[in-house]
């Protein structure tokens, strides 16, 4: 728990240096779009020159996707008490289909606003909420289906291309991929983005009340994304700690963040997070609704849930996990499972269904929920409340019965032009993972798949970021669009900052491995650049090009801490005499000096060694 008194909260909520410090040799750059206010951020990684016999060879910079927002831009000063600039506000206003409200329209939002006891916790600079004008639909899917390319779509297209046109010839080589039916173009255009969103194959989570967000896209024909979970609980964390966690997550590469808070002051905590987040924020609204009935699932009502949806939509939540696929007939299917129902949201709704012996209000009021979603452009993340919690329960009838229902609900949401992604498992052994992707594509009509792992074995508590990253890489290759990270603390406790970092890096590896396997254009460029740096013993460039430069440097310095070791032409694994890359370089130098190609140099070198062996007496072992 934080020891900071509430009355000085606003002074306490400041960004820690470690969360906003740019990576070494990295610079925030912006690619200009078609309008002055459309500037797309990238991270430019500079490299050192390669020494050659004739001078120095320039190594071009590498451009990479950047999720850290303006925080890592040293030219921008961000005050967390004021929040981020409303990047998308002019775009939203220009469309002319929304209106500003005088204040919150949810009962709970009004109650919190009028409570004087919360003044010290409240984010001070709250904008009036915005809502669609009567009869209007303000979703990105609706615009896409009208043939409109929004600034958000253009922003996404520029961002996904990662400045491929500037890619050096040295880094362009890429192995052909196997995309399992995905249709990934060589260049992502705004029109392609529009078409994918219109078809429902991709979503751009972009609530009109979260204008601070930098547009991003989730779909299998785009880069694989990762989500990071954070949130307080009844026994831990504070507002300032949750904001800090969000900053930490996006620095290391979180594409979206889910606030799963279940403790005190959920409403106020969420406001602080959204106002300072450049990435989409997701929630599970049933968690907060449950708090409103003191944790008694059977006392939940549609009215309480509806008010919670409006409350969160008007704060700016970009996507809601809603477990509308849990139906009363499916609950008995879990009776013989090894681990039953492991989803929190799933167990809440199962308990409600059994207590009332009828279908859940999430299912029966689904079209009413769609009406709310399209008034704010909140995307559905249709929850997998019956996901397997052990590999023994993988791919059972309960799991797939719910999945088929999610496909039916997707059709209903699309009828309202509401954006949808589908949540997936869970715990699945490797040989059963592909079937999950195939079933999802078959029954959910190519809506983006968003999976928790899956974990490929149950025997590694403390290492579930690894057991799940294996499954995540596989299912990402097969077509999953976003991977929900798992930390080493999964099943054991609440993650700290180091656990969050470890989980994110494990999932960045999984997502990138999937992009490589799919053959996503330009995915291999960073690998090629790092491999070249490794071969040329450019140690600092190796560190800087890695997903975790600080860890790479730390590990190197544990063995070779001297500054001179960073210029050494060998590594700590093999030493100076057995380094395979150094030997290869020696062969190339020999070839150059004697006017030979590499094959001739190897043959000539072997011949010289043979002569030396014979001259020394042709003895295998020499007396010393």
UniProtKB/Swiss-Prot annotation:
Sequence positions that bind [4Fe-4S] cluster: 571, 574, 579
Region feature Disordered, mapped onto this chain: 40-61
Binding site for substrate: 229, 258, 287, 323, 343-345, 384-387, 423, 450
GO molecular function: 4 iron, 4 sulfur cluster binding; carbon-carbon lyase activity; zinc ion binding
Names of required cofactors: [4Fe-4S] cluster
Residue sites binding Zn(2+) per the record: 427, 491
Assembly and oligomerization: Homodimer.
Protein name: Phosphomethylpyrimidine synthase
